[in-house]
């Protein structure tokens, strides 16, 4: 009798069983959707044959809305109700975005993420992004002829937990099942790696409309391993537009604050066209009339533009150096540099990348499309449509360390930065005081040694710990980061089994430069941080020793004569005074002096306990 053959899950070859999944590049300036068709990834066009969907949503008074090209065409005439570059606001609070360069919107002060007032009511960045995602979903279903089982949506590698969660929420609102949030540079590497069968060390330089990412990847026989990631979640092509915008106004003697919102949007649109023209011409002309009758006519050379944006170009190289340092490689070790994002079409970017890495960048895939193509490949795999050439493994990383606060305001790192995800790490902690029945778990993110210098992500409490002496309880704290880069934390007391957990969902994310600043500060202040940590550890141990000694004196002080008691009291007082200073060595010495001075007392207490335990018992009972 022949054995029945059962396919591995997801390996069924029948074409009618193929599950439809797409990759979506939710961009700051433009968004795209791609799918694998006939084993080849391709970007899906709209009815007019356009693959790029401008990431623009216009809200109308009657509750209607315009999305994409139609909305973009009206941005200059109705700027307050036409939301552009909404990705910059994802996971951000009002205080973080109110200074957004030349933004014509009325921001609303609401709990958590920023809100924008429109004629159709107050809208959140999640709602605006959902409109864009829903449009792409509809395009995909119309093109592919069926409903989608899910989507892989790309995000900047440097998006923090709040920004990632906001992206998932937008997808859910758009009716999309998120198979995975995939880092944009990694998606690009998938597209390049599978297309070219590449191996070796690669850098992915991703400059989009609103974000910058630099990832170092190692490609080896189908394994995509991210060695390090860096970036700036508030740097992109929009900033180059604003630099040129400010220059044009300065030349005309105008102030942006005095312009009507529609003039700001009109001028930004014209400046963007000017910037794009300078990518292929030595100079370009600007000719525009504002609503107040002011006429601006200027000619800008490429050299002038290059000078204006040089500080922005250098800002991309700072995280590039950090990522190389984290990966422990040099520019000479890099086999190829992949350019991603429409902003990398600028000659100033390509020249800077070529100069830094000592080689021309790879540009054989469209930088606007490469991320969506890689996401489509990953989506097809996650949907179960595996083929013979799909035996590859993706290993992504987290950009910043995750830790927990311990006594004295110290940070104990649980998962270090650039750890491969998904990942789970656990560590055991204990109680500080006798009879302690609860423990506060404070989850932090950053590279510094003190909690005050790191970003607070979440707090929760583990209650119901059985009363025990200090140090007897065993609390196991587990950090778990899923494949989307989202964090969950679990705490469990090992003896009783009592447990608590939290899914980290901060109300909004890190400020524009916080992540880069965290890393930069950690490098600059490493020695100072370690000294501060040593001091706090010494102070915590001194406090523990004082409390333990005082508890022992209260319980068994009669075991000491007056001279012995006075000596111990003197050492306790000395330690308490010294512990208030900033000399860790002196504190450790005073702590040791108290420990040495109470050795005999501890021995007498032990004898007393043994005698009490044996009192009234026969020898054969022992």
Curated annotation (Swiss-Prot):
InterPro entries: ATPase_NBD (IPR043129), Heat_shock_70_CS (IPR018181), HscA_NBD (IPR042039), HSP70_C_sf (IPR029048), HSP70_peptide-bd_sf (IPR029047), Hsp_70_fam (IPR013126), ISC_FeS_clus_asmbl_HscA (IPR010236). Keywords: ATP-binding, Chaperone, Nucleotide-binding. CDD domains: ASKHA_NBD_HSP70_HscA. Gene3D superfamilies: 1.20.1270.10, 3.30.420.40, Actin, Chain A, domain 4 (3.90.640.10), Substrate Binding Domain Of DNAk, Chain A, domain 1 (2.60.34.10). GO terms for biological process: iron-sulfur cluster assembly. One of its GO terms (molecular function) is ATP binding. It holds the Pfam family HSP70. Belongs to the heat shock protein 70 family. This is Chaperone protein HscA homolog. The lineage of its organism: Bacteria, Pseudomonadati, Pseudomonadota, Betaproteobacteria, Burkholderiales.
